[in-house]
Amino acid sequence: MRLSGRDLRCVRGGREVFAGLAFEASGGEALALVGHNGAGKTSLLRLIAGLLTPEAGTITLDGGEPDTPVAEQAHYLGHRDALKPSLSVGENLGFWRDFLGGERTDLSAGIKAVGLGHAAELPAAYLSAGQRRRLSIARLLVVRRPIWLLDEPTSALDVKGQELFVGLMQEHLARGGIIVAATHTPLGIPVREQRIGAAT
């Protein structure tokens, strides 16, 4: 499996963020996007996720589902946790599982995998910032998709939470998955760097 972008141009708010950008990541590989603030790291993740449309260029996934858009074969974990405060941990995760569709796994397994088994019935409003982040990470587990797009994924996680997430990323890569991440802190796994924008 290979995820690639060719001659990508991104414009936001009338400003060109980048042009002529190319990238490539193979199954089992983590690609870390590096560059100064505003260089377009988050914009590239959002292009791959289908949340933005490129002004030019193409994004393809060789070895994926041929009739399924790349965006529907990717998970995007952004800055915000996108949780409904009044819903429980289990209900929030169930909502995302049903919304995302595809091949599904057991909710309880996903909740336990991120260390929230004791809080499955607790409303999200009562979770700490780190627990909310763990619940967002659980979305990656209950619907299997080969591409993980991660924007500052370890924000709000304590050391134990970061170690847990490292294990989940390692398992995803071992299954042949792809990770593309924008982060200011090390992911804790081997990565290949992709510079976005001019070197600083």
UniProtKB/Swiss-Prot annotation:
Ranges where the ABC transporter domain occurs: 3-200
Top enzyme category: translocase
One Gene Ontology CC term in the entry: plasma membrane
Molecular functions (GO terms): ABC-type heme transporter activity; ATP binding; ATP hydrolysis activity
Subcellular location, principal: membrane
The EC number(s) this enzyme carries: 7.6.2.5
Keyword Transport: yes
GO biological process, one term: cytochrome complex assembly
The organism's place on the tree of life at top rank: Bacteria
Keywords from the named record: ATP-binding, Cell inner membrane, Cell membrane, Cytochrome c-type biogenesis, Membrane, Nucleotide-binding, Translocase, Transport
Catalyzed reaction equations: heme b(in) + ATP + H2O = heme b(out) + ADP + phosphate + H(+)
Record-linked PROSITE patterns: ABC_TRANSPORTER_1, ABC_TRANSPORTER_2, CCMA
Location relative to the cell: Cell inner membrane
A Pfam match: ABC_tran
SMART domains: AAA (SM00382)
Family to which the UniProt record says this protein belongs: Belongs to the ABC transporter superfamily. CcmA exporter (TC 3.A.1.107) family.
Protein name: Cytochrome c biogenesis ATP-binding export protein CcmA
Native organism taxonomy: Bacteria, Pseudomonadati, Pseudomonadota, Alphaproteobacteria, Hyphomicrobiales
